[in-house]
Amino acid sequence: MTNSIGIHFNITFIGAGNVAWHLAPTLKDAGHHIVQVYSRTVESAEALATQVGAQAVNKYEDVEPTSHIYIYALTDDSLQWVMNHIKIRKGLHIHTAGSMPISIFKQVRDNYGCIYPLQTFTKEKRVDLRKVPFFIEANNKESETLINDIARCMSQKIYRLSSEDRKELHLASVFACNFSNLMYIYAEKRLGRKNIPFDVLHGLITESVNKVKKIGPRAALTGPARRGDNRILDQHISLLHKDPEWQEIYTLLSEQIKKM
């Protein structure tokens, strides 16, 4: 995506994980200059820095205080630690965490906010950010305008959301993405015991997602618990006798489905 705002910023990335691997190249392609990539692991910093033509640093004292924007693409635990060690007050400081309030910056930065891309990222699979929803927040109007401009270099879907509401969004995302993926992992494990390839479920998964998108999750819900088919439910619970934790999960989820 081209840089529609007509201004090029010097940007430093703090963190070189999955989120940084998507945001940094996209911002570079939009015309911004990625100055530095910091990671406590030098190999991680160098790998991303090479991709975006930046300097790699792995010591917090080597992070230059001259960038316009600092993007903290870190885990929640790492964010607090890094902020206490990289003591740069100038510039605009932006974290990308769904569950962290922007007030984490309050005592140590003057201008700050959040850009939260609602997507699951891995380095191995590049995501087209243009249709990924980005949720932004800032501590003042000037910072919000700048964060909005930066976000629009990456996505067409920008929303303003408070820290409290972003926590709810993050929680919902865990249910929709992480927990569903856990179910896929267990399904793969069960199939593997019988030498059945997981890809036999691909069509089912795709159709389920398509129906959810078209008619909504409640209307798309099917299966024995939805039908009240207790014979099948008892059969499944019996099959899970060697996995008591999953037997409990199956029972609990089935009871929740019955209440829908």
What is the predicted function of each stretch?
Residues 22, 47, 81-82, 104, ...:
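Phosphate- and divalent-cation-binding pockets in alpha/beta enzyme and binding domains
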